[in-house]
Amino acid sequence: MALKQISSNKCFGGLQKVFEHDSVELNCKMKFAVYLPPKAETGKCPALYWLSGLTCTEQNFISKSGYHQSASEHGLVVIAPDTSPRGCNIKGEDESWDFGTGAGFYVDATEDPWKTNYRMYSYVTEELPQLINANFPVDPQRMSIFGHSMGGHGALICALKNPGKYKSVSAFAPICNPVLCPWGKKAFSGYLGTDQSKWKAYDATHLVKSYPGSQLDILIDQGKDDQFLLDGQLLPDNFIAACTEKKIPVVFRLQEGYDHSYYFIATFITDHIRHHAKYLNA
Amino acid sequence: MALKQISSNKCFGGLQKVFEHDSVELNCKMKFAVYLPPKAETGKCPALYWLSGLTCTEQNFISKSGYHQSASEHGLVVIAPDTSPRGCNIKGEDESWDFGTGAGFYVDATEDPWKTNYRMYSYVTEELPQLINANFPVDPQRMSIFGHSMGGHGALICALKNPGKYKSVSAFAPICNPVLCPWGKKAFSGYLGTDQSKWKAYDATHLVKSYPGSQLDILIDQGKDDQFLLDGQLLPDNFIAACTEKKIPVVFRLQEGYDHSYYFIATFITDHIRHHAKYLNA
């Protein structure tokens, strides 16, 4: 599992690095970013995974979210993968901004031609953690996950499909009920085919209804002026209703005047990192 | 002086906006970013001008520096212009990344074909402040300036050439002695011609030697692993020697392991905004 370092920049006393590797799950080269806080120089740290939204690479979060100060203070290694395989020469992979490249939706595709490469679910939950645990000073037992929009969807389903794997989960403007929203219908029909039962296995609102697991403290921030909320792409109300019914605690904060941008994320990122640090450093 | 709003995003309770206008000085359309902190809703705030470095637009600083939290807390309106005129159809304007587009060097060009458009000094010190004072809730008497690299050079010369105009000045990795460094020689010979006395009028190290002005508290952060420092583009030692001789107080902090990137700026931006707030809110 050879890693090639692409960049390394000092930031808030730690190091923001980007690496490239040949992904076995995705059958292509993948980049990921990893932040090593000062504490990582002298011991193992918890690992916090960030999943980005549509059209993003590993760069958007590390350059725009302003997360480094709190990650440095709380001593968290923060990992941010790319949002899909790239350069797979699949016909149509670059045709839309909400499907294919930059839009892997954190699922394992079952349909041709996507199934050979589009396995972001297994990449994020299996291959990447194994790579991180093997190459960086992280404690494999202390892992949490969060994300934005499509990445918020990814964080929620990874946590709900793996009870106990993550200490905590949070999301910014997550796609909460993809089986019912335009983005989700387009992605799931393309990657998973027409059998909607396969869709539900990657839908947070459905997963909550049958969540058998342990305590899961979910934090969600949502901008009230988020165009995609108004367009019915995110559907947080459905998710909250399902959590309420199942008595799963979720803190949902509707933020007046905020939108879907990284300005919204930057404003509340410290709260989210504090949320995770509470569990990761417990 | 019609302003066209390009974008507006809520961030740390304030609004990060970008506007476009027809610049009289530069004879072209120019964009600038302005952050209005929550305090700007109820009263006039001080104005802090940021000047960016080579290849930047108004976007780099507002999306990568993480300045919003401290600007919001200290109640400062922060303005970030672009780094040169654009789209002027001057032969060669886009040929190099360190001259022409994205590289206006904050001077008023005297040479053809640049002198018609390349008047960034007057734009930054006259036209933009007049525009800001006329259109935003700012106190014209309370203004400070800071910048990075070429923008650090810009901030230093604007302050040194206008004693009393700015309450404070600071810089990240500034080009301190452009008449002696490759970037400066290329830019000044192109914009100002071969008469080196004209160059010195835009060189911070020379300007300090004849600075008649009032108290000026200068803060400079410089990454010790900054490739451009090692390449002799920045020359801070010359500037510090000149300040020492003239007994002008300058705090110069050499930061171990840091480079020229926005990760370096993000790490110390709060210190700089606090530095300015001390004088602007005095």
UniProtKB/Swiss-Prot annotation, chains A, B:
Record InterPro entries: AB_hydrolase_fold (IPR029058), Esterase-like (IPR000801), S-formylglutathione_hydrol (IPR014186)
Gene Ontology CC terms, in alphabetical order: cytoplasmic vesicle; cytosol; endoplasmic reticulum lumen; extracellular exosome
Gene3D superfamilies assigned to the protein according to its UniProt record, in alphabetical order: alpha/beta hydrolase
Effect of S149T: 1.3% of wild-type activity
Subcellular location: Cytoplasm; Cytoplasmic vesicle
GO biological process, one term: formaldehyde catabolic process
Keywords: Acetylation, Cytoplasm, Cytoplasmic vesicle, Hydrolase, Serine esterase
Main location: cytoplasm
S-S pairs: none
Modified residues (N6-succinyllysine): K4
Residues found modified as N-acetylalanine: A2
Mutagenesis or variant effect for D226A: 4.3% of wild-type activity
Keyword Nucleotidyltransferase: no
Residues the record marks as active site: S149, D226, H260
Enzyme class: hydrolase
Entry-linked SUPFAM superfamilies: alpha/beta-Hydrolases
UniProt-reported outcome of changing D226N: 9% of wild-type activity
EC code(s) of this entry: 3.1.2.12, 3.1.1.56
UniProt modified residues of type N6-acetyllysine: K200
GO MF entries: carboxylic ester hydrolase activity; hydrolase activity, acting on ester bonds; identical protein binding; methylumbelliferyl-acetate deacetylase activity; S-formylglutathione hydrolase activity
Domain of life: Eukaryota
Oligomeric and partner information: Homodimer.
Protein purpose: Serine hydrolase involved in the detoxification of formaldehyde.
Protein name, entry field: S-formylglutathione hydrolase
This protein's encoding gene: ESD
